[in-house]
């Protein structure tokens, strides 16, 4: 006799799969908040109830560190004018790196028109 998976089994597998995929996208971040006075309350106020706080460091200089789940870095786009003879691909990348912290640039060409476009964390 062949077993037919029930709808509940399929839904359960889908939920488990979605949870695992979502966990792999999340990263662990740390935020140092200075001295330990009210560390747990400050962490939870800034990063939500699921964060963890700890105080560590040398005696007399304990510092508050919050550990929390953070998502992938969001990328923004910007433009820095035209690409061409005066500014090639390397020039565009260099200009984007100078203008936007962590930025990278590339020349996007459509027909005879070429723009310097930047991607950077925001």
From Swiss-Prot:
Signal peptide: 1-26
Location in or out of the cell: Secreted
InterPro entries: LCR
GO biological process: defense response; defense response to fungus; killing of cells of another organism
Keyword Secreted attributed: yes
S-S bonds: 29-70, 36-55, 39-64, 43-66, 76-122, 87-107, 92-116, 96-118
Keyword field contains Transmembrane: no
Main location per the UniProt record: secreted
Superkingdom, taxonomy of origin: Eukaryota
GO CC list: extracellular region
Keyword annotations: Antimicrobial, Disulfide bond, Fungicide, Plant defense, Secreted, Signal
General function of this protein: Confers broad-spectrum resistance to pathogens.
Alphabetized PANTHER family for the sequence: DEFENSIN-LIKE PROTEIN 181-RELATED, DEFENSIN-LIKE PROTEIN 183
Family classification: Belongs to the DEFL family.
Protein name as catalogued: Defensin-like protein 181
The organism of origin for this protein: Arabidopsis thaliana
């Amino acid at each position: 006799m062949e077993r037919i998976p029930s709808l509940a089994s399929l839904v359960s597998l889908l939920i488990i799969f979605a949870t695992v995929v979502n966990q792999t996208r999340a990263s662990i971040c740390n935020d140092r908040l200075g001295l330990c006075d009210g560390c747990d309350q400050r962490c939870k106020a800034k990063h939500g109830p699921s964060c963890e706080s700890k105080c560590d460091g040398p005696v007399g200089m304990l510092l508050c560190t919050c550990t929390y789940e953070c998502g992938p870095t969001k990328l923004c786009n910007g433009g820095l004018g035209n690409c061409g003879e005066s500014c090639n691909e390397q020039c565009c990348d260099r200009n984007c790196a100078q203008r936007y912290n962590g930025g990278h640039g590339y020349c996007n060409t459509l027909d005879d028109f070429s723009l310097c476009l930047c991607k950077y964390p925001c």
